[in-house]
A protein has these predicted regions:
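A non-catalytic, amphipathic alpha-helix used as a structural packing/dimerization or gating element
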Residues: 129, 133, 137, 160, ...
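Conserved, mostly hydrophobic/aromatic
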Residues: 25, 57, 92, 134, ...
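Glycine-rich phosphate/ribose-binding loops and adjacent secondary-structure elements
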Residues: 163-166, 175-299
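Glycine- and acidic
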Residues: 151-152, 159, 210-216, 325-328
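Short acidic/polar active-site loop segments enriched in Thr and Asp
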Residues: 55, 140, 209, 262, ...
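C-terminal extensions of enzymes
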Residues: 1-19, 27-31, 43, 146-152, ...
Length: 393
């Protein structure tokens, strides 16, 4: 069973500190969830995430359904036994991946028929099937099956998807058979404020254990994302956890928290780490750049992670450019540690009543492209709005 308690609130914003308690762990919120689509974050072990302080990880039902299969995982004792991850797990229903990764997708009110992005095999997932798969996987928190639309989309398409998501939400609730697994509903509605409000007002009375905002970070500008949060979050009850799906750039974490969000997930820290992007307190470092060949300083002087306290930028540049596997691992460790530390700082500021000053100081210091030069900066721009950011991590 899941319980959620609010411990502190911020007088200058909607930020709050709380605890999300499952049978396996107590998670301090606001919290960021690392994404291990196939059961683990690439290049990391469960112990690595434990050392960083993470108590909740996201696994993806779409990927695990395709391989090794939800029935195989159930036979092996469920995700916790299979992966040896001792803390809480949230599974994304796979709706986003069905509509973004699949080679072919036909959607009706009954469900979605799609072809696997792996081998082209045809599959059908209904709301009931999505719940069945997630219950077999055995996560602590599972998600309703939703229809996520790409942007831009026509107003009619966005409205139809929001209505279908509500229809599917009711069916997911009816299909839910394991009370020890919390079930979250998802709000859709694109960039239409009125539709977002309507979706939230229709979903809240259904009685989900938590509420998620989906369909953002799919190509829209940041002001549009924040505008949708500004109208949607006030419609959600303060007594239940609020989850912003697939959003995870540092500046978005700070702004999401300010608007009352409790949970985030994104592949950004792990995927960017594997491609050589390192997050720091002042911006991002592209470690492949030649400027770091002789740089003896750590990636971030302010970071307490084992990478920054042990290795230089020069060494990280070396292992990355020679394609040593250790390079991707060290980069991922640093990035996920940076995200965990950022969330700790946010929670501390809220508890101490200094979140407003923390927020202002963060935006003064953090520049997403501060350490990126020329064409590399240009190539970085699309990553911010990559519509597959909730994909394979």
């Amino acid at each position: 069973m899941l319980s959620f308690q609010i411990l502190n609130t911020d007088s200058s914003s909607s930020a709050r500190v709380g605890t999300l308690t499952t049978t396996r762990s107590v998670v301090e919120t606001p919290a960021f969830m690392p994404v291990g689509s196939l059961g683990n974050v690439r290049s990391l072990e469960a112990e690595d995430l434990e050392k960083m302080g993470y108590g909740l990880m996201l696994n993806n039902a779409y990927h695990l359904y395709l391989r090794p299969g939800h029935k195989v995982i159930a036979e092996l004792g469920g995700l916790h036994a299979f992966t040896t991850w001792p803390a809480a797990i949230l599974t994304d229903s796979g709706g986003f991946q069905v509509f973004s990764l699949a080679k072919f997708c036909k959607v009706t009110d009954d469900g979605a028929t799609f072809q696997s992005h792996l081998d082209g095999s045809t599959h059908f997932v209904s709301p009931e099937r999505a719940i069945e798969i997630q219950e077999a996987l055995g996560a602590d928190i599972i998600m309703a099956f939703d229809q996520c639309v790409a942007l831009p989309s026509t107003e009619d398409h966005v409205r139809d998807a929001a209505k279908r998501t509500l229809l599917w939400a009711r069916r997911c609730l009816n299909a839910h058979r394991r009370p020890e697994q919390a079930l979250f509903g998802i709000i859709q509605g694109g960039l239409n404020p009125a539709l977002r409000i309507e979706s939230a007002r229709d979903l809240v009375p259904l009685g989900f254990d938590g509420l998620a905002i989906g369909g953002l970070s799919v190509g829209e500008d940041k002001p549009d994302m924040y505008r949708i949060l500004d109208v949607t979050v006030p419609e959600l009850p303060s007594s239940k956890p609020r989850y912003l799906m697939g959003v995870g750039m540092p500046e978005d974490l700070v702004e999401g928290v300010a608007r009352g969000i409790d949970l985030f997930d994104c592949v950004v820290p792990s995927r960017h780490g594997r491609t050589g992007w390192l997050f720091t307190s002042t911006g991002r470092v592209l470690i492949k750049q030649a400027r770091y060949v002789r740089d003896e300083t750590p990636v971030d002087e302010a970071c307490p992670c084992p990478v920054c306290t042990r290795y230089s930028r020069a060494y990280l540049h070396h292992v990355f450019t020679v394609k040593e596997m250790l390079g991707a691992r060290l980069n991922t460790i640093h990035n996920l540690w940076f995200f965990a530390e950022l969330m700790r700082q946010i929670r501390r500021a809220i508890r101490e009543g200094s979140f407003a000053s923390f927020r202002g100081r963060f935006h003064e210091q953090y520049r997403p492209y501060e350490s990126i030069s020329g064409g590399d900066r240009d190539r970085a721009e699309p990553a911010e709005s990559d519509k597959y950011m909730r994909g394979d991590a």
